[in-house]
Design a protein with these regions (language model features):
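Bacterial N-terminal signal peptides
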Residues: 5-17
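Glycoside hydrolase catalytic-domain context in secreted enzymes
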Residues: 17, 22-688, 694-711
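Short beta-strand elements
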Residues: 712-721
Length: 721
């Protein structure tokens, strides 16, 4: 979605009702909708009774304000990995504000830590309140467009960087963590409102304005919709964005599932918005309606209540043509006001504790927020290879380190990033870690053989490579075929800088590769020939510090992969094949991956023992407790991610070869042993019966598996469903 699309959505035309004299403040507070003691729906009834039709139409934008009544709308801000009030896209361009920036969503996913994502959400939500309510800034919004609950079914997808991976349970669990952090823990009010995107199956960029993602209802309910359902029912989100694409031929912004599933079945009764310019695309690209009036009318009838588009004329024409009624508009804009009530925007300021977030130092400059950014980045780092315990480095045994590569002295920001208050590059982090005791040489490229010469003269070479999140090019343009972003899918999985890695490795066998990337690469040669490889995502302001902490052993990496890293493009089905049963993701992939889903190494070792189930069958609550003892058998503290998978043995329908249904990241001191308990829920084992239009829990033999990755099973046991 382009910046201009977002700006257009908030430029609402003046209507006659706004020309009336402003009501005095005392009169405003007398309105029943200002009384927090009244039921929410009664307060909304009062608002609707006071609005003119023109004012109601104005509430179909992203900032449903009614100045005549003193109602100030919510607005929208981006926030996938930190509040975006600046950055490469110049969000909030009239008053850009620095904010704490975390790793991209891909890196947040690799933490496998929903509690940590809750901390990320708290930081982001607090900074949103502060920026809006502090008189010095007085800017921003309280509806935050995050998380991205799309699934990374294909590593070629240009926006893989935004997602938490290919698995619905993992993505949903992490999304719930971020949502709860953004919205806060107050029983009455929200800190901010989390708006998930993009519903649904929106994982190709090329042609997304017109393509249809085709798959059956089972995959809708069992795969693609799972993170969104969890975000609503478990996380409490009451806002999401409909995607550009169609599902089985029906564009998502007018698809009946918006109303019939998310509203009627899940209880999503807040904001449902379009993507930028999507209203025009219904006519121009999808050719689904004869004109924009028809398109706007059907969108409202399906539940859309906020347009990121120039919508007012189409809505007005739809009303004139009787394609839409005032009651239709009343029905949907109730959701806008429900969200405003939860944000406390219609209540006295003293009633809402979040309204007091406006004093004190800028939060993005505090040690607390900096520490969260560093911890998240540390936890996101995945150790892919460590031959002969090459890492961690002992700086007392080193005299010279060569830091090489185009990403070594950069912290690159993506389109949805804000502006961090500072950044620490890999080079800067390494220099700060070793101080004056070790000589650091730096070469960006191998021009004039400089990188090779530096590597030959060093005790160890660290090569830092990866993608450019904006492709260092204009919109919809990526000169490097292996790179992608919004509007551009990747055409290759080959890392162009692997040639540099080869040159350095031949010059110095003691080479470490740091892959800073927004998605997987087919780095087969590197895996076979380089002794140590780590992966981390782009964008974190603490990238260099966290990386240095890992390389020199001050932090033991425990991140895990969230996608299957394939060896070649030939391992993948066609890009637009949305039926994952055709060999997609760890659930159905039939080949030998370069790195499997859930994989990640540590500087220590772990032993699993005493695997047991809570009983021979599920209890009356439909739950089964799965326990295993995990011991750190090494000499340093480390994190293990215990993963619970299931596979159906005799299902009457086609099922995945395995499915993640539980996980827990635990920190264990050297030699410490702990019992890890995971709860398997029968509700998560059902399949969607298309004939009966409901979930079914079938009688079956269920294999319960526990281990550190999808390809490494330590224990398994069959239980009867």
């Amino acid at each position: 979605m382009k910046v201009l699309s977002c700006l257009l959505a908030t430029l609402l035309a003046l209507v006659p009702g706004l020309l009336r004299a402003q009501a005095p403040a005392t009169a405003q507070t007398a309105y029943p909708f200002r009384n927090p003691q009244l039921p929410a729906e009664q307060r909304i009834d009062n608002i609707l009774s006071l609005l003119t039709l023109e004012e109601k139409v104005s509430c179909l934008g992203t900032n449903p304000s009614i100045p005549r009544l003193g109602i100030v709308g919510t607005g929208h801000s981006e926030g996938l990995h930190g509040l975006a009030l600046g950055g490469p896209a110049h969000w909030n361009r009239r008053h850009e504000v620095p904010t704490t920036q975390f790793p991209q969503g891909y890196g947040l996913g690799e933490t496998w830590d929903p509690d940590l994502l809750r901390q990320v959400g708290r930081v982001e939500g607090y900074e949103a309140r502060y920026a809006l309510q502090n008189p010095k800034y007085a800017t921003g919004s309280l509806v935050i467009r995050a998380p991205n609950a799309d699934l990374g079914r294909d590593p070629r997808w240009g926006r893989t960087e935004e997602c938490y991976g290919e698995d619905p349970f993992l993505t949903g669990t992490l999304a719930v963590g971020l949502i709860k952090g953004l919205q806060g823990d107050d029983p009455t009010y929200w800190q901010t409102a989390a708006l998930m995107k993009h519903f649904l199956a929106n994982s190709n960029e090329v042609g997304r304005e017109r393509t249809s993602s085709n798959f059956d209802e089972r995959l809708f309910h069992e795969y693609y919709a799972v993170p969104f359902r969890m975000g609503v029912t478990l996380g409490g989100s009451r806002a999401y964005m409909a995607s550009y694409n169609a599902w089985n031929g029906t564009p998502m912004m007018v698809n009946p599932v918006l109303r019939d599933v998310t509203v009627d079945k899940w209880g999503q009764n807040g904001i449902i918005c379009t993507d930028g310019g999507a209203l025009k695309l219904l006519v121009r690209e999808h050719h689904y309606y004869p004109d924009s009036a028809w398109a706007a009318a059907q969108a409202v009838k399906m539940g859309i209540n906020q347009f990121l588009d120039d919508y007012k004329i189409p809505i007005t024409n739809a009303l004139k043509a009787k394609l839409l009624t005032e009651l239709d508009i009343d029905r949907v804009i109730r959701g806008d006001f429900r969200v405003m009530l939860k944000l406390g925007l219609l209540d006295p300021p003293g009633a809402n504790k979040y309204a007091a977030i406006k004093d004190g130092p800028e939060p993005w400059l505090t040690d607390q927020h900096k520490a969260v950014a560093r911890l998240v980045t540390q936890k996101s780092i995945v150790l892919l290879k460590n031959e002969g315990s090459f890492l961690p480095l002992d700086k007392s045994k080193l005299k010279t380190i060569a830091v090489i590569g185009p990403r070594a002295d950069q912290v690159l920001l993506d389109w949805y990033s804000g502006t961090p208050p500072y950044v620490v590059s890999a080079l800067a982090g390494i220099k700060a870690k070793v101080g004056d005791s070790v000589k650091i040489t730096y070469e960006e490229t191998n021009q004039d053989n400089r990188a090779v010469n530096a590597a030959q003269a060093a005790d160890v070479a660290i090569v830092v490579v990866g993608n450019h999140p904006t492709c260092n090019a204009g919109w919809a343009n990526c000169p490097d075929a292996s790179e992608g972003k919004e509007a551009v899918d990747r055409k290759s999985l080959t890392l162009s800088d692997e040639a540099l890695i080869k040159q350095v490795r031949r010059a110095n066998p003691r080479t470490i590769v740091v892959l800073v990337s927004s998605f997987p690469y087919a780095i087969t040669w590197t895996q076979q020939n380089v002794p140590a490889i780590v992966h981390l995502a782009q964008n974190s302001q603490e990238l260099g510090n966290a990386l240095a902490d890992v390389l020199f052993g001050d932090y033991n990496p425990g991140g895990r992969l969230t996608q299957t890293w394939v060896r070649a493009l030939s391992d993948l089905p066609p890009m637009l094949d949305y039926d994952i049963r055709n060999g997609r993701t760890y659930q159905y992939f039939r080949g030998e991956p370069l790195y499997p889903f859930g994989f990640g190494l540590s500087y220590t070792t772990f032993r699993y023992s005493n695997f047991r189930l809570g009983g021979p069958k599920f209890n009356k609550a439909g739950e089964l407790l799965v326990s295993v003892d995990v011991q750190n058998t090494g000499d340093r503290t480390g994190d293990e991610v215990v993963q619970l998978y299931i596979s159906h043995q005799h299902s009457v329908v086609v099922r995945p070869q395995q499915e993640l249904k539980g996980f827990q990241r635990v920190t264990l001191k050297a030699q410490e042993k702990r019992t890890v308990q995971l709860t398997l829920r029968a509700a998560d084992l059902r399949y969607w019966d298309e004939g009966r239009q409901q979930f079914i829990l079938e009688k079956d033999d269920l294999n319960v598996l526990v281990g550190p990755s999808s390809r490494e099973v330590k224990f398994q046991q069959v239980v009867r469903l």
